[in-house]
């Protein structure tokens, strides 16, 4: 018996080795099999699981010199021409443990950065995964300068081109091709997801689009607007991070328990309309460490108010309350916001010397009138996507410090009004989940671990993983009624302190008891 067991083990080992060799051989042969128009293969390599992959060609500003890879995969890197004067850098990661699903990742900010962490995440879940650099390298908007083709890549063409090429490569590499196609992105990646919904409705069966940067031109102007409110760090209207903490604590004091629980988390920011007069320093007060001046209180009120244009029309909704501490060092730091500066200098005015400290709503009007390649991405008629059978799931953190979650609520309302559909009808193809305690795409004070990436992973169960929830919706017809978030005790990957079910909009979470606020069953969507 011992001899038979040994022979059996050897046979199994040989079969596994043969399987491994077959996969590696197939990977090595891929480079010479690619004969696609405008596609220039740079290299193909087999990458074993457990590798910390060096990324020497990744722009330093992208902030990733390496990426941990959890699964055996075949990596193909290429350049794809998008016009006579533009091209994208594209990578496809084909995992050994393939599930028959194709997925495209997105990007962030103004960046030309392949999001390798998303490639690793999706490939690790068995998706044939592609990611592109948006038509330029690095996080600056300078490559847009006098290069409209690069702007077009950024606006819509990069992701779509990557999808077209990626699907062809997937069919070339895997004998069975793919059965369903998906998208996963956040921020600019969220906007790209909705651009696919609006412009390329047949590209994906299921789209997960987080914190979308749609209403893009007005978002850029809104981000520029904050400097006009705060002024420089010597202005009387400026608040230091410590002062923003004072404001935040008062906002939480006024709004925390509106959901029924005192847990430091605002579950429904729509109910929160704080009055900051309560923390204005008294005349002649000697101790001003825990209060604000009248000018500073006005700044907070202005930040928490919508931005209107030259003719009084709404351009962008308010920053939702509760994000003050996280936004202080980014949006209200006494300096113009760099993405806004770059967009105005290199796209709107094509003038690298444009003075970003002089921005006004007249500039916002000029930018919106330009709207190159409809980068606004705010078309509310998504009937073609619905007709194609597509599903879109969007989420937005209610502590988002860079893109107001109120903008996602505005778009939801515009879709409902334009398509003349109540939430019960929208639910068939478009579901929106505000996530309390989540900052921009991940992180925050609450249960933000929804499985939208490596930094928020809490298992593959569809109830705990927003991407797998989309897979279940597309492939089994089971739509998510909630998305469960995990509150990590010490950050991503640490012990889960508690979980919370985040409600499908327009429902909101209310604490009913009788358990502690950490008990997800003590909450109810109403």
Curated annotation (Swiss-Prot):
Localization per Swiss-Prot or TrEMBL: Secreted
UniProt entry tagged with the keyword Metal-binding: yes
Enzyme class: hydrolase
Cystine pairs: 27-74, 62-113, 186-441, 255-272, 281-291, 503-525
Active site: 187 (acyl-ester intermediate), 400 (charge relay system), 440 (charge relay system)
Gene3D superfamilies for the chain: alpha/beta hydrolase
Glycosylation site residues: 137, 233, 311, 516
InterPro entries registered for this protein in UniProt: AB_hydrolase_fold, Tannase/feruloyl_esterase
Reaction catalysed by this enzyme: feruloyl-polysaccharide + H2O = ferulate + polysaccharide
GO biological process, one term: xylan catabolic process
Predominant cellular place of this UniProt entry's protein: secreted
GO terms of molecular function: feruloyl esterase activity; metal ion binding
Any matching Pfam family: Tannase
Binding site for Ca(2+): 256, 259, 261, 263, 265
Signal peptide: 1-18
EC number: 3.1.1.73
UniProt keywords, alphabetically: Calcium, Carbohydrate metabolism, Disulfide bond, Glycoprotein, Hydrolase, Metal-binding, Polysaccharide degradation, Secreted, Serine esterase, Signal, Xylan degradation
GO CC term (a single one): extracellular region
Top-rank taxon: Eukaryota
Family per similarity comment: Belongs to the tannase family.
PANTHER family: FERULOYL ESTERASE B-RELATED
Record's function text: Involved in degradation of plant cell walls. Hydrolyzes the feruloyl-arabinose ester bond in arabinoxylans as well as the feruloyl-galactose and feruloyl-arabinose ester bonds in pectin.
Protein name: Probable feruloyl esterase B
Native source species: Aspergillus clavatus (strain ATCC 1007 / CBS 513.65 / DSM 816 / NCTC 3887 / NRRL 1 / QM 1276 / 107)
């Amino acid at each position: 018996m011992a001899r038979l067991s040994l022979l059996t083990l050897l046979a199994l080992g040989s079969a596994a080795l043969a399987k491994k060799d077959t996969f590696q051989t197939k990977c090595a042969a891929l480079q010479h099999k690619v004969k696609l128009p405008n596609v220039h293969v740079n290299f193909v390599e087999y990458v074993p699981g457990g590798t910390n992959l060096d990324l020497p060609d990744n722009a330093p500003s992208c902030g990733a010199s390496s990426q941990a890879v959890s699964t055996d995969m075949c990596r193909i890197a290429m350049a794809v021409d998008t016009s006579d004067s533009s091209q994208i850098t594209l990578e496809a990661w084909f995992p050994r443990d393939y599930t028959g699903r194709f997925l495209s990742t997105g990007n962030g900010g103004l960046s030309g950065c392949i999001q390798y962490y998303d490639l690793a995440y999706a490939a690790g879940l068995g998706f044939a995964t592609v990611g592109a650099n948006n038509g330029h390298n690095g996080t600056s908007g300078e490559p847009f300068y006098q290069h409209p083709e690069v702007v077009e890549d950024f606006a819509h063409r990069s992701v779509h081109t990557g999808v077209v090429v990626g699907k062809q490569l997937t069919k070339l590499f895997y004998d069975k091709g793919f059965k369903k196609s998906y998208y996963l992105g956040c921020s600019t990646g969220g906007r790209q997801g909705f651009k696919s919904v609006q412009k390329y409705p047949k590209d994906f069966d299921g789209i997960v689009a987080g914190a979308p940067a749609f209403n893009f031109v007005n978002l850029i102007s809104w981000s520029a607007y904050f400097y006009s409110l705060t002024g420089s760090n010597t202005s009387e209207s400026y608040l230091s991070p410590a002062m923003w903490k004072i404001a935040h604590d008062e906002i939480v004091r006024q709004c925390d328990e509106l959901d029924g629980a005192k847990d430091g988390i605002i579950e429904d920011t729509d109910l929160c309309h704080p009055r900051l007069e309560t923390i204005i320093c008294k005349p002649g007060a000697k101790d001003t460490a825990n209060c604000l001046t009248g000018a500073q209180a006005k700044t907070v009120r202005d930040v928490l108010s919508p931005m209107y244009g030259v003719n009084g029309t709404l351009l962008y909704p308010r920053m939702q309350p509760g994000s003050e501490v996280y936004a202080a060092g980014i949006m209200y730091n006494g300096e113009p916001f760099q993405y806004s500066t770059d967009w105005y200098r290199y796209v709107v005015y094509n003038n690298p010397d444009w003075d970003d400290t002089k921005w006004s709503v007249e500039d916002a009007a000029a930018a919106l009138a330009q709207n190159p390649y409809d980068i606004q991405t705010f078309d509310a008629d998504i009937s073609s996507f619905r007709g194609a059978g597509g599903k879109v799931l969007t989420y937005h953190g209610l502590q988002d410090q860079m893109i107001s979650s109120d903008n996602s609520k505005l778009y939801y309302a515009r879709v409902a009004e334009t398509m003349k559909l109540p939430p019960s009808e929208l639910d068939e193809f478009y579901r929106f989940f505000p996530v309390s305690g989540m900052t921009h795409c991940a992180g925050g004070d609450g249960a933000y671990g929804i499985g939208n990436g490596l930094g928020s992973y809490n298992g593959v169960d569809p109830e705990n993983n927003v991407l797998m929830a989309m897979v279940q919706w597309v492939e089994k017809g089971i739509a998510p009624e909630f998305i469960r978030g995990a509150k990590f005790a010490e950050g991503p990957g640490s012990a889960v302190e508690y979980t919370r079910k985040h409600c499908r909009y327009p429902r909101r979470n209310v604490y009913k008891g009788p358990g502690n606020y950490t008990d997800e069953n003590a909450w109810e969507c109403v």
